[in-house]
Amino acid sequence: MSNQKKRNFQIEAFKQRVVVDPKYADKTWKILEHAIHEIYNHNASGLSFEELYRNAYNMVLHKYGDKLYTGLVTTMTFHLKEICKSIEEAQGGAFLELLNRKWNDHNKALQMIRDILMYMDRTYVSTTKKTHVHELGLHLWRDNVVYSSKIQTRLLNTLLDLVHKERTGEVIDRVLMRNVIKMFMDLGESVYQDDFEKPFLEASAEFYKVESMEFIESCDCGEYLKKAEKPLVEEVERVVNYLDAKSEAKITSVVEREMIANHVQRLVHMENSGLVNMLLNDKYEDMGRMYSLFRRVANGLVTVRDVMTLHLREMGKQLVTDPEKSKDPVEFVQRLLDERDKYDRIINMAFNNDKTFQNALNSSFEYFVNLNTRSPEFISLFVDDKLRKGLKGVGEEDVDLILDKVMMLFRYLQEKDVFEKYYKQHLAKRLLSGKTVSDDAERNLIVKLKTECGYQFTSKLEGMFTDMKTSHDTLLGFYNSHPELSEGPTLVVQVLTTGSWPTQPTIQCNLPAEVSVLCEKFRSYYLGTHTGRRLSWQTNMGTADIKAVFGKGQKHELNVSTFQMCVLMLFNNSDRLSYKEIEQATEIPTPDLKRCLQSMACVKGKNVLRKEPMSKEIAEEDWFVVNDRFASKFYKVKIGTVVAQKETEPEKQETRQRVEEDRKPQIEAAIVRIMKSRRVLDHNNIIAEVTKQLQTRFLANPTEIKKRIESLIERDFLERDNTDRKLYRYLA
């Protein structure tokens, strides 16, 4: 094996310098320069692009790239200055057309030149970090043509003038506009923005500022909104046709500011045509347009919502505090429902079912519904009217819709316990008189109340229905155990559980003998089948059906109250009775007796008795006889039927007092629950917590809460802190 060292072979560089003929570069450039002239002069068809490419290639290869690049700039600049002169000389409409044609020519020339100088573009330009040929061509066009002192301002003014003409209804060459504005975009984003878009937006702002002032002085609100809507569509169309897509948001913002935002207050409050006028006259289309336009600008919808709320509250306040409109409870509630329906339609059809508008509607209704302290009573009376007669022949879905509307008003009530009080009274009268049109509707409403307020709210109402069912079963048992009673008067007894039904003072009266005997038999039966029970007859709540024969044998069935029955039965044994005699025989209290006689002797069509002397009032000196001339086209005649009417002022005060008494234990229970959980709490937090817990039933009065706290302290449920008297402690 050889131990010789390995040798490294080296190849030395060629030492003899290759010398290129100095005239070569000049000759080659002349060829290329001539070709560029020919291209700009539209004589490129006779050129050999392969040969030209090879010449440019060799110049770069032999280090004459700089000469080639500099020559290109000089030659292109020469031609562009010539082009500029020709464009400057163009008159009128020919100006833009020539500019566009020369721009297209320049682009075609630039493409050919770039193809010829492709090798220079890839090597020399990249190495020396110079501007590439295509971009160079754009810059030279910009600097020598677009920025020419005689073209720049003229070009901008021409374009803006064409836009103005189009805005005022003239037809313009949109294709030409698109091509020229596309030129700005091709020259670079900054060129488009600084040299066209910015002045375009400024001119647009001025145009719409002037136009909006003209419109607002000559149009009503609805007409103005139509005119404001139109340019928003037109400007988007303008962008699509000949502007940069990025300009859409900017020009839209200009129109929104000048046509809408700057006039929001004036438009909304415009006399005889602003938002209030639209609300009053159900102008859904105008309101919908206002909503869609105002949502585009800051605080636009807030303004619309605030004006609607203010109007709604003023209208509602007038509605519920007008004494004339409070005379009929059913009409009072129906007006509330009509207004609610109206604004539901407005919000749905015009305001895009906007939740913030819905919330404003709800808060407004809650505000004015509670301004009238009788709203809970009136809503209950409305239900009473519907469930007595108003829902006859109404489909199940429509019934449910009406009940849902009632529940909507119920939710607005701050004193739901007051509603409960009245509802219980009215339900009791319906059940006892058998005057409800639908048991299903009655139960359906109770289910809705239960869902809304919980079991505690409806437990007594459900107890009333239970009593009605139990009473029916009890009566069947009573008559089954006394078959001998099938002949004679029929007794129908409702056994009411104390606590479930509204408490009423027990008013005793002397029942007719045949009825009294039946009552005693029922008492014996009931107490014999139930242990630990006590029965107390509520004759003032009863009704009776009695058959009567008048002069000439005319027969009728009279539906009367128990008191009226007691009076009428006396005339089976007497032809003529004085007020005093009736009073002694029946022992009906004076106010009730007078009302009873008045309904039978002084009401046309119900006057089964005749009073002597004739007058509208009942006096203790009056005498009464059966009215032999009584006639009615109906066999069954209702006399003095019990209908729910709004309470008198004293009755209202009495109900209010009962409600206040019922609230006391509820407030105390809430305080105890809170303190048991928190152990120690200050006065203000107790007030806040109690109010929050009870708000589903009523709005607790802070003064009453304070009284209940004092009462609980006295009974050792709570104590004050020794160091901080505003703190309370729970005593286990």
From Swiss-Prot:
PROSITE patterns: CULLIN_2 (PS50069)
Cross-link type Glycyl lysine isopeptide (Lys-Gly) (interchain with G-Cter in NEDD8), residue numbers: 676
Pathway membership, UniProt: Protein modification; protein ubiquitination
Deletion consequences: No visible phenotype. Cul3a and cul3b double mutant is embryonic lethal.
Keyword Cell inner membrane: no
Subunit structure: Interacts with BTB/POZ-MATH proteins BPM1 and BPM3.
Family: Belongs to the cullin family.
Protein name according to UniProt: Cullin-3B
